[in-house]
Amino acid sequence: MYHPNYNYPPPQPGWGGGYYPPPQQHQQQQQWSPPPPQPYYSNGYPPPSQSPHSYSPPQYPPHGQYEYGHHTPTPPPSSGSQYRSYHSHSPSWGQMPPRPPMEAQQFGKGAPSNYRFQYSACTGRRKALLIGINYAGQPNALRGCINDVTNMSTFLHERYGYRREDMVILTDDQQNPMSVPTKANILRAMQWLVKDAQRNDSLFIHFSGHGGRTPDLDGDEEDGYDDVIYPVDYRTAGHIVDDDMHAIMVRPLQPGVRLTAIFDSCHSGTALDLPYVYSTQGILKEPNLAKEAAQDLFSAITSYGQGDFASVAQTAIGFLKKAALGESARERTVKTKTSPADVVMFSGSKDTQTSADTFQDGQARGALSWAFIKTLQARPNQSYLQLLNSIRSELEGKYSQKPQLSCSHPLDTNLLFVM
């Protein structure tokens, strides 16, 4: 693992998240105010109010001191499967799913006219960014996030041929200030991840830590809220908004570049603002306001019975925003957030759900991170649909969260999952 010297300028203020000055009181009042945090990955609530005193702002080394190396691409694990038709049928468990087609694909209805995307063969260079934040020494600390990153690093190296030299690992137990997951370091590492990416390269980002929500300012969210993640220095630097992560890691990618994202945090359903979200039947999801109204009503009744009147009000406001913005927000997202690249994300929960900090295989783990690794170790050659259902099956009966599959383009969910 190389220590980073990113040498990239910070995002411009127009990105909406950028590098914030220390948050002022009036800024805090504008954010959604959820109920007190539970022992989960934030429950949509920022990490504890105590300042992360263990971490001072990083002092960046001189140019060249922590450079990344450049290495010959490592070929992917061999497979005897040949490419098949894009329009594939759902394979059985004993059948190898078809590999992705190499010709350009059309987006179809709802996307810009004459817009095409390209699947990645994942035969080029591999790079990975792994971020795990336990928020050590803070009242709302987590236990499993650093373990998640350690396990994911080993899994990527042993199963998918990612070189240790091409991984950047940011965790809050490291002494090197460039390896601490501050907002500045995370944003620079995201820029490093996608820099100079070429067709058939395979990029990977894994975030395990606190997540939450903040009011949507650009009208691209069906529920009126943006998803956010919390760096270790969120108290002084602010959170990182999904719009910014999309602008940094999705928008610059060329056709045929693969970015696989695993977000094991609360309210992470659309953490990269990918417009195509799929059900466990492989069907593209559309806003269903009638169903969501029933779910929100049940949530409100439950909160009322528990005396949580703040949640009742938030639920009501949230549904009213969905009703007013849902269809137009989706249309805006499809028009502005599609990509010719091959970006796929598995998230720990829906936008409205929390994600569990759990104990599995003798150590604290994030539920999604654990299930993702376990199911691919047991059955490496799964389709996207099989993988989504396998992950959900691992969590079903243990946790209430429902992991999500989303993509930057229309996805044939019966194709072989590759990365």
From Swiss-Prot:
Residues 82-93 have a biased composition (Polar residues). It comes from the Eukaryota. One of its GO terms (cellular component) is cytoplasm. The keyword Protease applies. Residues 51-66 have a biased composition (Low complexity). Keywords: Apoptosis, Hydrolase, Protease, Thiol protease, Zymogen. It holds the Pfam family Peptidase_C14. The keyword Protease applies. The active site is at H210, C266. This is Metacaspase-1B. It comes from Aspergillus oryzae (strain ATCC 42149 / RIB 40) (Yellow koji mold). The gene is casB.
